[in-house]
Amino acid sequence: MFPEIEKISRRDLLNITLNVLKKYGVKPREKLSQNFIIDPEVIKLILDQVPRDSIILEIGTGIGTLTYYLALKAHKVYTVEIDRKLIRVASDVLRDYKNVEIVQGDALKINWPEVDYLVSNLPYHITSPLIIKMIKYGIPNAVITVQLEVGERLLAKAGSESYGRLSIITQCAYIIERLRKVGPESFYPSPEVSSIILKLRCREEKCIEDLELLEKMTNILFRHRNRSIKWVVSKYFGNEFLNYITSKNFNVNARVRDLDLESIVKLINYCIECEVNLQ
C-alpha cells in the first residue's frame, strides 16, 4: 500500500492520502481533530524512538499510515479509532498485517492492553485526560505529537506562564524529552497551529504514589495560580494547618505558580500528617 519510508516524499504521501480518502468517500472531521500525517521525516523520527519487536498502542488509527510503518517494526500494534468510517479504511489498508489489531472505540472509555509504547498524534480536545489515563495505566514509554501550546505546558517549569496542573501531573510520572517541532504542512488537512513531538519515559519512582491526591491538590492550588500559598491554605485548609506548615519553614509567601513539584508533594504530605481532607 505504502512505499518504503526511505523512498517516499511528502508529496507522494499526500497523494496517497487524498486517493484513499476519495476512494472511500471520507472527509476529515475537524470535530475529531482528524489531521492525517503526510510527512515521511516525522514518521521516520517516530519509528526511530520505538525499539524493534515492541508491543505498541496507537491512539487514532486514521487511514492507517503510521500504523502501517509501525507494523513493519513492531511485534504487535493495537490501534484504536473512534470513527467507524476510518475503521473500514484502515481495515482494508492493513488487511495483510496479522500483527495489527484494530479496535473501534473511544480511547478514554475502553480498556487498554499492556504495552511497551504508546504512539499517538493526540487530539487536542482530549490530550489532558489521555495523559492522565496513560499514567494510571502505567504506560512505560510514549511518543506523542501534540499541539505546540500543549507541549509547552507539558514541558513547563515552575514560574513560567505555561506551568500548571498538566505540567506537574505529567512530570511527576514521566521524564519528558522534546524531539522536534512539526509544522502544519506535515498533516492533511493542515491544522492552524504547529505541533511538537515529545518522548515520555516513565520515572523509576513517581513523585507520589497516589495520583488522586496530586490531582486534588493541584486542582485547589491552580484555581488561584497568582495567589500566595498563605492565602490559598488559609481559605481551604484553615489557619491551624497554615501555622503547621509555617513551623516547617514552608514558604507560605510564595505564589502558587512558583511552587515546584517537590514543594507540592511536600504540601500533600503535610496534609496527610495533619489528616487534612483534600476535597
Q: What is each stretch, according to the model?
A:
Residues 253:
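Interdomain hinge/lid region at the active-site interface
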